[in-house]
UniProtKB/Swiss-Prot annotation:
This is Alpha-amanitin proprotein. The modification (3R,4R)-4,5-dihydroxyisoleucine is found at I1. The typical symptoms of amatoxin poisoning are gastro-intestinal distress beginning 6-12 hours after ingestion, a remission phase lasting 12-24 hours, and progressive loss of liver function culminating in death within 3-5 days. One of the few effective treatments is liver transplantation. It comes from Amanita fuligineoides. Belongs to the MSDIN fungal toxin family. Coiled coil: none annotated.
C-alpha cells in the first residue's frame, strides 16, 4: 500500500496512513 502520487517505497504503509489522515 502506498500514498497517493507516491511510488512504493520503504514504509509505504506509514505514508499511506499519513496521506489518508491529511487528505
Amino acid at each position: 500500500i502506498w500514498g497517493i502520487g507516491c511510488n512504493p517505497c520503504v514504509g509505504d504503509e506509514v505514508t499511506a496512513l499519513i496521506t489518508r489522515g491529511e487528505a
